[in-house]
Amino acid sequence: MAMSSFLINSNYVDPKFPPCEEYSHSDYLPNHSPEYYSSQRRESTFQHEAMYQPRSACSEQLYPSCQSSGHQAAVLSPRGHVHPPAGLQSHLSEPNHPCEPGTPSPPPSCSQNSLNQSPSNSSCKEPVVYPWMKKVHVSTVNPNYSGGEPKRSRTAYTRQQVLELEKEFHYNRYLTRRRRVEIAHSLCLSERQIKIWFQNRRMKWKKDHKLPNTKIRSNPSSSSASLQIPPAASQSRSSGPASSL
């Protein structure tokens, strides 16, 4: 019914559309000239140059020896490629030698420091060996000594040492361990030397005063004979009560 009314009614105006050429994009988007794109490229190159500036500064700090004051600076293209000046092209054609960064030399080793020290410092650091710390009864040090019991030699006391020992013996014929250590330190002798000297001095003192030697034991047969009762005394005791009877 609707279609028939549409076809019958001839007063209906048919809509008309503009041609397709009028709907081109040029009406809505402006046409840009080639200068517009060239300006954009220039802006992008400026941004790249700003980004590469700190890296160029770092290269100047790391390799100061590779730069020369007489040469011109390299030109940076918009693409980021470096174009050297015309004067440097002949030099760049030759084989380039790697530039080594300037690094500080390493400090000398401890062995070199020890060798450079003066002999006076080394002598001061040597440990002090006192006479009482050395081995007793060894006259000379043999470098070819391979071991075994060293040969003992007689100790030669000085006059001052003998005088001090005689003074001590006059007051005390027997020394304590503490006093023996004190005398050994004061006279630069060992405890064994002090002990042997006092033993010999006591033997000499007993001999001068005719005292018996306490170290020599008496004969057991003589002591037992002295304890036995003589036979004459035993006979007199047995005959006494018989005569009274």
UniProtKB/Swiss-Prot annotation:
Biological processes annotated in GO: anterior/posterior pattern specification; embryonic skeletal system morphogenesis; positive regulation of transcription by RNA polymerase II
Function: Sequence-specific transcription factor which is part of a developmental regulatory system that provides cells with specific positional identities on the anterior-posterior axis.
Region (Disordered) residue spans: 31-52, 69-122, 208-245
Sequence similarity: Belongs to the Antp homeobox family. Deformed subfamily.
Biased composition (Polar residues): 215-227
Protein name: Homeobox protein Hox-B4
DNA-binding feature ranges: 150-209
Stored Gene3D superfamilies: Homeodomain-like
Lineage: Eukaryota, Metazoa, Chordata, Craniata, Vertebrata
Cross-referenced PROSITE patterns: ANTENNAPEDIA (PS00032), HOMEOBOX_1 (PS00027), HOMEOBOX_2 (PS50071)
GO molecular function: DNA-binding transcription factor activity, RNA polymerase II-specific; RNA polymerase II cis-regulatory region sequence-specific DNA binding
GO cellular component: nucleoplasm
Keywords from the named record: Developmental protein, DNA-binding, Homeobox, Nucleus, Transcription, Transcription regulation
Localization of this protein: Nucleus
Residue ranges of the motif Antp-type hexapeptide: 129-134
UniProt entry tagged with the keyword Membrane: no
Cysteine pairs bridged by disulfides in the record: none
InterPro entries reported in the protein's UniProt record: Antp_homeobox_Deformed_sf (IPR050609), HD (IPR001356), HD_metazoa (IPR020479), Homeobox_antennapedia (IPR017995), Homeobox_Antennapedia_CS (IPR001827), Homeobox_CS (IPR017970), Homeodomain-like_sf (IPR009057)
Compositional bias (Low complexity): 110-122, 230-245
